[in-house]
């Protein structure tokens, strides 16, 4: 085999490998998530298990479920400030972001801290058999600062303060 032919084939093989890697990366970014995984519809818990006093964490949906004015609300665990995980503080009855000190009420509305808006939400549907389904494929932005639909001060000391 001549040197020229060898180099030509090596260039073709290299170009093919780069094209395949680019196609794989593009497919991986653009593909939809399977049903039951983040980015899709996730069946969670029974409607009756979601109470107005607490926030129930659903790991597969990366979501907290709570009940506001009789309706189940799904709040994304991600802080809208810089994306840290927001935790439910049972003693205070509110959500706290330990990264930069944002506080959110039970409805996910920002109460204090650097967060630019309330916690983002996912669409919720209750099936005929009473299962709460969370559609994590579409994110609804949280309420702007100053929105306070719940008149609930913290119940006690915050978890970050303890």
Language-model features: locations:
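Structured, soluble extracytoplasmic/luminal domains of envelope-associated proteins
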Residues: 78-120, 125
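N-terminal pre-ligand scaffold of iron-sulfur
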Residues: 5-92, 125-162
């Amino acid at each position: 085999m001549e040197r020229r032919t060898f180099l030509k084939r090596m260039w073709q093989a290299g170009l093919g490998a780069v094209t395949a890697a680019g196609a794989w990366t593009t497919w991986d970014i653009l593909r939809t998530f399977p049903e039951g995984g983040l980015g899709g519809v996730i069946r969670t818990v029974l409607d009756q298990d979601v109470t107005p006093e607490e926030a129930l964490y659903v790991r597969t949906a990366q979501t907290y479920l709570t009940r506001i004015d009789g309706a189940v609300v799904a709040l994304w665990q991600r802080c809208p400030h810089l994306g840290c995980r927001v935790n439910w503080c049972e003693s205070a009855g509110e959500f706290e972001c330990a990264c930069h000190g944002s506080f959110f009420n039970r409805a996910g509305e920002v109460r204090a801290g650097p967060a630019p808006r309330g916690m983002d939400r996912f669409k919720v549907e209750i099936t005929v058999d009473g299962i709460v389904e969370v559609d994590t494929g579409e994110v609804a932005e949280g309420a702007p600062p100053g929105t306070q639909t719940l008149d609930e001060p913290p119940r006690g000391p915050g978890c970050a303060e303890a």
